[in-house]
From Swiss-Prot:
The chain crosses the membrane at residues 5-25, 34-54, 72-92, 99-119, 120-140, 154-174, 196-216, 230-250, 259-279, 286-303, 314-334, 356-376, 393-413, 432-452. Its EC number is 7.1.1.-. It is found in: Cell inner membrane. The gene is nuoN. It catalyses: a quinone + NADH + 5 H(+)(in) = a quinol + NAD(+) + 4 H(+)(out). This is NADH-quinone oxidoreductase subunit N. NDH-1 is composed of 14 different subunits. Subunits NuoA, H, J, K, L, M, N constitute the membrane sector of the complex. GO terms for cellular component: plasma membrane.
C-alpha cells in the first residue's frame, strides 16, 4: 500500500514538490530561469516514470479505492505532461516568472488527479485544482483592459459548472450510498429520475468546462483576453483533461438511447456552431476559441459509440488536438507576436517561410486534411461511431467538418497570397528561440502521431 502510494503517484509527487520549490524560489527572488529549468526537468522526470509504469504494466487501487492507476491513467497523464513540457518550452520566450510556472504546475497536478480518479471526491478535487489557476493565469502579466473581464466571466461560469457537479454528486450519493464512479455508472444503467437528474447535472458541468455548445459562452472572451501561451493552455491541456475525465466517468459503460441522442445532438450543435462562427473571425484567438468549440463537439461525438472502442479513439484525438493547438499558437507567436489580428499573416510566407509552413500544417491538421494526424484522429472517431450504427450522425459530422475547412484554409491562403501586402509588425523584444523550440517539439510529436497512428491501441492492449 505504501509502495503503491509512493510509486503509483510519483508523477504527482514530483509536481507537488516542484510547486513547493517554485514557491520558495519566488519568496527568495531567485532568477526566473532556475524556475523554468526546474519546471521542464520535473515534467520530463514525470514522463519517464509514466513510461516505466506503462512498460511494466503497473496497476493499483489506492487511497480506499479512490485512486486507480491503470493504462488509461498512465497514458492520459503522459499526454498531459508531454503537452505541458511543449507548452513550457514555448513559454520560455515570454519571460514567464515563478508565479506563471506555479500556476501551470498546479493545473497540471489537477489534470493528473482527474485521470487517476476512481471516485467522485478525487475527481472533483482534480477539476477544481485544474480550473482555479486558470483564472489567475489570464490576468498574470497581462496589460489588456479586457483581461479581468474575461477572467471573471470564466470564473463565474466555472462556478456554475462546479455547482452543477456538486448538486449532481449529492443525488449520486443519495441514490448509491457512495461516491464511487463504478457505482454511479451501474446505477445510471438501471434508470430512474434521480439517476437521470444526477447524470444531467454532472455532464452539464463537464460540458461547460469543455466549452461544449450551448455551454461555451465563456470561451471566446476568455481565450481572446489571455496572453497567447495561456490561450494555448486553456484550449489544449484544460480541455484535454476535462474530456478525458468524462471518459474516466463513462469508461466502457453502455449508454441508453436517450443519453446517446442528447450527446449526439450537443456534439452536432457544437460542430456546426463552432465551424460556422469561426468563418467570420478576424482575430486568431477568437478563431481558436470557436475552433475549440467545434473540436469539443468531435470529442463528444466519440461518446456516441457504445462498442468500447471510443477510449482509444478519444485518447488519440485529444493528444493530436492538444499538441496541434499548442504548436499552432507557438507558430503564430513567431509570425505575429501577441497581436492576434489575422491580417498580420498576409503574405508572411515571403518573410518567415518555415514558420508559415509549420502553422499551415497545424491548421490543416485541425481541419482534418489527409494525411495529417488531425485527419487520422477524425477518421478513428468516425470509424467507431459508424461501427456502432450511427451513420446519419456521422454524415452530419462530416458536413460540419467540411464547413470547417473554409476558415482553416482561409488562414493558409492569407500566408501564401503573393498579391497581399505584408503588414509591418513591431520588433519583438523577446528572444524567439524558445518559441521555435516549442513549435519544433510539437511538430515532431505530430509527426510521431502520423507515423504511428495505432500507438494508443498498442499501449492500451499491452502489445
Amino acid at each position: 500500500m505504501a509502495t503503491d502510494l509512493l510509486y503509483g503517484l510519483l508523477p504527482e509527487h514530483i509536481l507537488l514538490g516542484l510547486i513547493l520549490v517554485l514557491m520558495l524560489l519566488e519568496i527568495l527572488s531567485v532568477d526566473k530561469r532556475a524556475g523554468s529549468a526546474l519546471f521542464i526537468a520535473s515534467l520530463l522526470a514525470g514522463a519517464g516514470v509514466l513510461v516505466m509504469q506503462l512498460q511494466t504494466g503497473y496497476t493499483a487501487d489506492i487511497v480506499m479505492n479512490e485512486i486507480r492507476i491503470d493504462r488509461f491513467s498512465e497514458i492520459g497523464r503522459l499526454i498531459i505532461v508531454s503537452c505541458g513540457a511543449i507548452l513550457g518550452v514555448y513559454s520560455l520566450s515570454s519571460e514567464a516568472g515563478h508565479k506563471y510556472w506555479i500556476l501551470i504546475a498546479s493545473s497540471l497536478l489537477g489534470a493528473m488527479i482527474i485521470l487517476d480518479s476512481a471516485g467522485f471526491i478525487s475527481l472533483f478535487m482534480g477539476i477544481e485544482i485544474l480550473s482555479l489557476p486558470g483564472f489567475a493565469l489570464m490576468v498574470l502579466n497581462n496589460g489588456k483592459s479586457t483581461a479581468s473581464e474575461g477572467s471573471i466571466k470564466y470564473l463565474l461560469l466555472s462556478s456554475v459548472a462546479t455547482a452543477l457537479v456538486l448538486f449532481g454528486l449529492s443525488l449520486v450519493y443519495g441514490s448509491t450510498g457512495n461516491l464511487n464512479i463504478s457505482s454511479f455508472t451501474a446505477a445510471v444503467a438501471t434508470g430512474g429520475v434521480q439517476n437521470l437528474a444526477a447524470s444531467v447535472m454532472i455532464l452539464s458541468g463537464f460540458f461547460l468546462k469543455a466549452s461544449v455548445f450551448p455551454f461555451h459562452g465563456w470561451a471566446p472572451d476568455a481565450y481572446s483576453s489571455a496572453r497567447l501561451p495561456v490561450t494555448a493552455f486553456l484550449a489544449s491541456i484544460v480541455k484535454a483533461a476535462v474530456v478525458l475525465g468524462l471518459v474516466r466517468i463513462l469508461g466502457n459503460a453502455v449508454l441508453n438511447p436517450e443519453a446517446v441522442t442528447v450527446i449526439a445532438l450537443l456534439s452536432m450543435l457544437s460542430m456546426f456552431y463552432g465551424n460556422i462562427t469561426a468563418i467570420h473571425q478576424t482575430a486568431f484567438k477568437k478563431m481558436l476559441a470557436y475552433s475549440s468549440i467545434s473540436h469539443a463537439g468531435y470529442m463528444m461525438f466519440a461518446l456516441v459509440d457504445n462498442t468500447g472502442a471510443r477510449t482509444e479513439a478519444l485518447l488519440y484525438y485529444v493528444a493530436v488536438y492538444a499538441v496541434t493547438t499548442i504548436t499552432a499558437c507557438a507558430c503564430f507567436s513567431i509570425l505575429s507576436g501577441e497581436d492576434d489580428n489575422l491580417d498580420n499573416l498576409n503574405g508572411i510566407f515571403r518573410k518567415k517561410p518555415v514558420a508559415a509552413i509549420l502553422l499551415s500544417l497545424c491548421v490543416l491538421s485541425l481541419a482534418g486534411i489527409p494525411p495529417l494526424p488531425g485527419f487520422l484522429a477524425k477518421f478513428f472517431v468516425f470509424k467507431t461511431v459508424i461501427a456502432s450504427g450511427h451513420l446519419t450522425v456521422a454524415v452530419l459530422a462530416f458536413v460540419a467538418s467540411y464547413i470547417g475547412t473554409f476558415f482553416y484554409l482561409g488562414v493558409v491562403l492569407r500566408m501564401f497570397r503573393s498579391d497581399a501586402e505584408t503588414v509591418e509588425q513591431p520588433a519583438n523584444a523577446t528572444c524567439l528561440c524558445w518559441t521555435w523550440g516549442g513549435a519544433l517539439l510539437g511538430t515532431l510529436a505530430l509527426a510521431l502521431f502520423m507515423l504511428l497512428p495505432n500507438i494508443f491501441h498498442w499501449v492500451m492492449t499491452g502489445i
